[in-house]
Amino acid sequence: GLIPMFLIIGIWGGPRRVYSAFKFFLYTLLGSVLMLVAIISIYWISGTTDVTKLYEIGIDVKYQNLLWLAFFSSFAVKTPMWPVHTWLPDAHVEAPTAGSVLLAAILLKMAGYGFIRFSLGLFPVASEVFTPLIYTLSVIAIIVTSLIALMQEDMKKLIAYSSVAHMGFVTLGIFTIQQQGIEGSIIQMISHGLVSAALFLCVGVVYDRMHSRLIGSYGGIVTIIPKYSILFMLFTLAALGLPGTSGFIGEFLILMGAFKDNFLVAVLASLGVILGAAYMLSLIHISEPTRLLSISD
């Protein structure tokens, strides 16, 4: 997906599309190079790259830490985890609507799958060793990017930063190495893929008509296009994890798994739920019309 997404952003993106496309390309490429070296090393050590066989024979413990770090370097960029997340807001803002949908719905989830299938599956000992690292980076991502999202006026950028926070919950849940945590992470990935993609589509709809993504430009829009506004509100509530929505199920299971493994980490991560509600509700605040809205359902 690297080259197609690079072309989508670079050719059909916004004014800063070239910068954003190359930033996305370089971050992803550099992370993937280390993983390629790790895959070659696994073949040299084990004589195979067949994942099923590697599960059976296992990988020597003395190599696991280095190999885990090499895979981690790739997955951390693709997730993305703090502090290698800075390419994502730029990519989302400059990408066309279709590009943002693909990025949110598919590409970000590949790293979560990789953590479960390869990091936990091939390097179980190293995964336990580096769990504190994952916890630290995940909690920082959840809190810091949520605070940054609170300050955003651009709807696309707000949703992009919220994606980093949501994926922070995913990595946290995976490395609780608890059934509830991992199941919650899988549900969260599916939920985020659907909900964030829908939000980007909703933003694209109004941007095509109004040529603005500023939250303040859409005051009173519910009186003009009520059907669209209700749909947008439903997806926003799902994104903040309202009980009864898919977002709630994923986050709840992740936090349940985290509380079983590390109480302090779970409490800190819970702050992300409160902050998530704050920045998402800023998208659907009630206000008077701020400009002439000449659009309709």
Regions found by a protein language model. Name each.
Residues 285, 289-297:
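Single conserved hydrophobic/aromatic residue that forms the stacking wall/gate
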